[in-house]
């Protein structure tokens, strides 16, 4: 019933611009955030509270493996709400040291034929100091990560201090931090994935916080570059890698080529990035999987795809576009599917399935 209702609501939402809908949903989430009884009521219905899904990961207890990916709650305006909707955690941001408006609108587009979204938002956010104020008003201990990126007007040569500022302001308010050097929508940002550029950024963030530090990488890296980042991650002793961000590739889309071209530049999330994100995850796990946590994100639409990421080496998962197209029941279905699959394989915890290559057996 809820799924059918959401499908009808989605048709209505798709008559409005994507960014307008995002603002409406954000306001709704802020309302749920502000009214504790409403938040508790939602939280009594949607989450899958199954002990088999609970994990201790880099010293943090995650009640469920699927989290909200960065990009939705950019300013930490509803940090307590995401657990009520069934997410095991939420990654807030991307946050930059200084406030910035992002790129000119329109900058957010739907590709419904591909169950995808194209965005060139450009890290629009209120800045680390204001986000810190929001987080200091939190009302729960739900798990949150914070994704930090480079301020657009800051030159690449000054990126280290820019990331350091964000880490100092936000590190102690999060359960973990993610260094974002992989968005395609800030000029020159992806160049910071090069090992010699990334090393001092990681060091600065690690020095500025006591919480686990991870790095988020692009799906468009070459295999050699993936290996180089993985080796650096081990060398620097970071907690994990988030794989992957959006893709700049336009290959294999069902949406007509001219329609996509008219949308312009940006990163694509959703189904089109699924296969490459899985390949990157598999390569990372083969290379460094026993030495750090891998978070699988990118095109997870079904419980089977979620299971495939775990079996390929992901300890935790994230999604954003899947929620847009699937609604709150998408979160619930993912968790029910993972729990059922664990039991189908006679496993008692997710960590036993990570990297196991066990197949999806449910019909």
Curated annotation (Swiss-Prot):
FMN binds at residues 70-74, 94, 147, 180, 216, 244, 270, 299, 320-321. Its cofactor is FMN. Pfam families: DHO_dh. InterPro entries: Aldolase_TIM (IPR013785), DHO_dehydrogenase (IPR050074), Dihydroorotate_DH_2 (IPR005719), Dihydroorotate_DH_cat (IPR005720), Dihydroorotate_DH_CS (IPR001295). The keyword Flavoprotein applies. Pathway: Pyrimidine metabolism; UMP biosynthesis via de novo pathway; orotate from (S)-dihydroorotate (quinone route): step 1/1. Its EC number is 1.3.5.2. GO terms for biological process: 'de novo' pyrimidine nucleobase biosynthetic process; 'de novo' UMP biosynthetic process. It is a peripheral membrane protein. Gene3D superfamilies: Aldolase class I (3.20.20.70). One of its GO terms (molecular function) is dihydroorotate dehydrogenase (quinone) activity. Monomer. This is Dihydroorotate dehydrogenase (quinone). It comes from Corynebacterium diphtheriae (strain ATCC 700971 / NCTC 13129 / Biotype gravis). The lineage of its organism: Bacteria, Bacillati, Actinomycetota, Actinomycetes, Mycobacteriales. The gene is pyrD.
């Amino acid at each position: 019933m809820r799924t059918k209702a959401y499908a009808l609501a989605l048709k209505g939402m798709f008559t409005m611009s994507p960014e307008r809908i995002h603002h409406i949903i954000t306001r709704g989430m802020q309302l749920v955030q502000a009214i504790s009884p409403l938040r508790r009521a939602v939280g009594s219905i949607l989450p899958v509270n199954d002990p088999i899904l609970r994990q201790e990961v880099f010293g943090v207890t995650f009640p469920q493996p699927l989290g909200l990916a960065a990009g939705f709650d950019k300013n930490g305006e509803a940090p307590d709400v995401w657990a009520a909707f069934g997410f095991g955690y939420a990654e807030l941001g991307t946050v930059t040291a200084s406030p910035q408006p992002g790129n000119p609108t329109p900058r957010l587009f739907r590709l419904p034929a591909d169950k995808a979204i194209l965005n060139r938002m450009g890290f629009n956010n209120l800045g680390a100091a204001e986000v810190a104020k929001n987080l200091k008003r939190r009302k729960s201990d739900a798990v949150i990560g914070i994704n930090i990126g480079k301020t657009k007007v800051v030159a690449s040569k000054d990126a280290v201090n820019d990331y350091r500022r964000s880490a100092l302001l936000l590190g102690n308010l999060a359960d973990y931090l993610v260094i974002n050097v992989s968005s395609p929508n800030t000029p020159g940002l992806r160049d910071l994935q090069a090992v010699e550029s990334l090393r001092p950024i990681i060091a600065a963030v690690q020095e500025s916080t006591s919480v686990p530090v991870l790095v988020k990488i692009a799906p468009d890296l070459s295999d050699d570059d993936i290996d180089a980042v993985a080796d650096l991650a081990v060398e620097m002793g970071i907690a994990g890698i988030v794989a992957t961000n959006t893709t700049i590739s336009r290959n294999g889309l069902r949406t007509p080529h001219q329609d996509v071209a008219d949308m312009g530049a940006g990163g694509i999330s959703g189904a089109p990035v699924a296969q490459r994100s899985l390949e990157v995850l598999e390569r990372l796990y083969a290379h460094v999987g026993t030495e750090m946590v891998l978070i699988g994100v990118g095109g997870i639409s079904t419980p089977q795809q979620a299971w495939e990421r775990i079996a390929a080496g992901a300890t935790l998962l994230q999604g954003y576009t899947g929620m847009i197209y699937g609604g709150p029941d998408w979160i619930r279905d993912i968790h029910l599917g993972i729990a059922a699959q664990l039991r189908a394989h006679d496993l008692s915890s997710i960590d036993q399935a990570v990297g196991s290559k066990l197949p999806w057996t449910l019909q």
